[in-house]
Amino acid sequence: MIVIFLGPPGAGKGTQGKKIAKKIDLPHIAVGDIFRTIIKTSTSEAELINNYVKQGALIPNEIVNQVIKVFLLSSKYKNGYILDGYPRNLEQAKFFEAFIQKPQIKIIYFDVADELLIKRVLGRYSCKNCGKIYNIHFLQPKIEHVCDVCSSSVFDYRKDDNKEVIKKRIKVYKTETYPLIDYYKNSGNFYIVNANKNEQEIENDIQKILKIN
């Protein structure tokens, strides 16, 4: 089974992707994390991608498509996965469908208010060791400065997150992705979750969609 999580930055896709992936025993692929890893390398591709990210612009389709294609060729994804953050527009969706040639896809769209998105994105950070996501407003570690999962005390605050860049990313996202939502609505496998809810409520709604006990 392939599950696609669609939604703007800060909608909660990454948090839910990790939790649901464990429940259905499928890998969670966070496309944003893939590109952040590439950016850390000393290559011309990394520099090019980083320029788009800093401006709040979407990375060109031809770059995204090829990176995802190479990534998904790994044998560990042959039985399915949760794909978080891709495709983001019609061109990417059609490329993806032609590449995978599998009919069993479920698309879940995270619908959330812009004001809440901005607050979530500005407040989020993660454990540098295990990747557990936290938020200064909504989800702090149980013990201050100690990760709940791995007990690390080293955290990563994303440098590309500031209010103006986030607003631009949301605007660009809507322009690019709303036509994709209309496209998927007619697929018969498109679902909407209210991502204004709290983390547990969103997880419960996704479990119902995927029929997880």
Curated annotation (Swiss-Prot):
Residues 123-161 are annotated as: LID. Residues 30-59 are annotated as: NMP. Coiled coil: none annotated. One of its GO terms (cellular component) is cytoplasm. It catalyses: AMP + ATP = 2 ADP. Pathway: Purine metabolism; AMP biosynthesis via salvage pathway; AMP from ADP: step 1/1. It comes from the Bacteria. It is found in: Cytoplasm. Its main location: cytoplasm. GO terms for biological process: AMP salvage. One of its GO terms (molecular function) is ATP binding. Zn(2+) binds at C127, C130, C147, C150. PROSITE patterns: ADENYLATE_KINASE (PS00113). Keywords: ATP-binding, Cytoplasm, Kinase, Metal-binding, Nucleotide biosynthesis, Nucleotide-binding, Transferase, Zinc. Its EC number is 2.7.4.3. Transmembrane segments: none annotated. ATP binds at G10, A11, G12, K13, G14, T15, R124, I133, Y134, K197. Belongs to the adenylate kinase family. Monomer. Consists of three domains, a large central CORE domain and two small peripheral domains, NMPbind and LID, which undergo movements during catalysis. The LID domain closes over the site of phosphoryl transfer upon ATP binding. Assembling and dissambling the active center during each catalytic cycle provides an effective means to prevent ATP hydrolysis. Some bacteria have evolved a zinc-coordinating structure that stabilizes the LID domain. Catalyzes the reversible transfer of the terminal phosphate group between ATP and AMP. Plays an important role in cellular energy homeostasis and in adenine nucleotide metabolism. This is Adenylate kinase. It comes from Rickettsia prowazekii (strain Madrid E). The gene is adk.
